[in-house]
């Protein structure tokens, strides 16, 4: 069966708002400029929407060789290729990650906007963060995504969920990279190796969801949905699944 790509997204800075794009350069580590940056605290620990839902109100845009971040009335810019020389060692969950700070001015801006000290850091080289996938029994070169380089969701999966919810939600809750048009809910779970254009992809594993999907990206208000409803029909092995993680071969 042929599937149509409906939407493409990148999330340049981990846990900040995403960008809808018409096209994207696919790489082994994920789409170009997708989750290549992240915020860390004074102990070099990852900062996410799980603890700071207000991160959803920071909106990045890539304009030529610059990244522009808007947060309400405040705007900050930095060069995409900009970074300091000194390496910083952090973690993305259980994975050691070698990153570098973008610049001091950008870190100060984020610290001021968030109200606590933090740094914006960037992963530079392939191999600076590796993820050991027990599911695939292999080590993956990944950017700063949670575990896998791409997230695929079928349109009917969201349509089915919205039929069960009192208030409909958008696909942005689930932060996919690729949204395809489907006719059967969650049929993407059962893909093996498949092709989009000239690119071959492999299904890695269904995506287990956390409380972050309960954060409304338009308002930064956290509720019990949609995780509460999803848990009634998408739970397996104590995880709630929505969408599937994929690799570009």
Residue map of PLM features:
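Metal-cofactor-dependent catalytic cores
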Residues: 1-249
